[in-house]
Amino acid sequence: MAAESAKQTPYVLVADEVEWARLDAMHNGIAKFLGNELTPVDLGQPKKILEIGAGSGAWAIQAAKLYPDADVLAIDMNPIPARPLPPNVRYQNINVLEPFPFEAASFDVIHIRLVLCHLPDGHSVLKRIIDLVAPGGWLLIDDIDWAEAFEGLDKAPGIKRGLTALVRSMEAEAGDPHYGKTLKPYLEASKELSEVHVREVELPVNPIPEDPALAGLSQMMRKALVGALGAAKQSSATVGLTKEVQEGFLSEMAREDMDWSYSCYLYFAAVKKSA
């Protein structure tokens, strides 16, 4: 659908083996931080689970193993890479900017990670996603705020230019690099939800925090940034991410003698549909 649709879902990185590996590593880092659970809330015994923006398929695989009796549908504009899948996982090619081909209230659990921030008017897509959640079901949303508090980067101009290019490339595709911080007020204003839990996590990219759980997540984000901004292939959507910017960013990220600090913010939302 994505290849034929007039509406293309924006994504500033090319989907290839390197990107699949980066997405796997990111999933593993987040899963470890969450204690290898999908969410702290009790999801009950879901029978139908939807993963929106499946990427490498890592989350769908985890969900299928945790809930072997559930049907797990992974949707994305790009196919899941060839890999062993549990028997209860299936893939469907869907562009989230198009109407969903599903009945309303047809999924017990829906998950979407780091997708809404890339979309034009993510809240309008989120509203359609909420419609798909069954009464009493759960919607799990993970998203980010690439905070533009760059004061701690004055001594790391290469890193500052790289992060600025990341933010501007998302904006150029009508995405919102600060989408995560809009989740809580939007969800709390919805009359369709009976419970709203949003956890904000300040995630230092540098220096690495002493807390072991947070340190692992920070190290994951550093590697993810290096993989994303240093990607050999960039789509035409990438704005300002020239070879010079890439090389400067990678060079400074590899150094241990530089004095700089920067934090982004992750948001983990678990919301329950009114019964």
Curated annotation (Swiss-Prot):
Induction: Induced in strobilurin-producing conditions (on CGC medium after 6 days of growth). Transmembrane segments: none annotated. InterPro entries: SAM-dependent_MTases_sf. The structure of strobilurin A was used for the development of the major class of beta-methoxyacrylate agricultural fungicides since its beta-methoxyacrylate toxophore targets the Qo site of complex III of the mitochondrial electron transport chain and prevents adenosine triphosphate synthesis. Compounds such as azoxystrobin (Syngenta) and Kresoxim methyl (BASF) are among the most widely used fungicides worldwide. This class of antifungals are used as effective treatments against a broad range of destructive fungal plant pathogens and make significant contributions to food security. Pfam families: Methyltransf_23 (PF13489). The keyword Transferase applies. It comes from the Eukaryota. GO terms for molecular function: methyltransferase activity. Its EC number is 2.1.1.-. Gene3D superfamilies: Vaccinia Virus protein VP39 (3.40.50.150). GO terms for biological process: methylation. Pathway: Mycotoxin biosynthesis. Keywords: Methyltransferase, Transferase. Methyltransferase; part of the gene cluster that mediates the biosynthesis of strobilurin A, an antifungal polyketide that contains a key beta-methoxyacrylate toxophore that targets the complex III of the mitochondrial electron transport chain. Strobilurin biosynthesis begins with construction of benzoyl CoA by step-wise elimination of ammonia from phenylalanine by the phenylalanine ammonia-lyase str11, oxygenation by str8 and retro-Claisen reaction to form benzoic acid, which is activated to its CoA thiolester benzoyl CoA by the dedicated CoA ligase str10. Belongs to the methyltransferase superfamily. LaeA methyltransferase family. This is Methyltransferase str2. It comes from Strobilurus tenacellus.
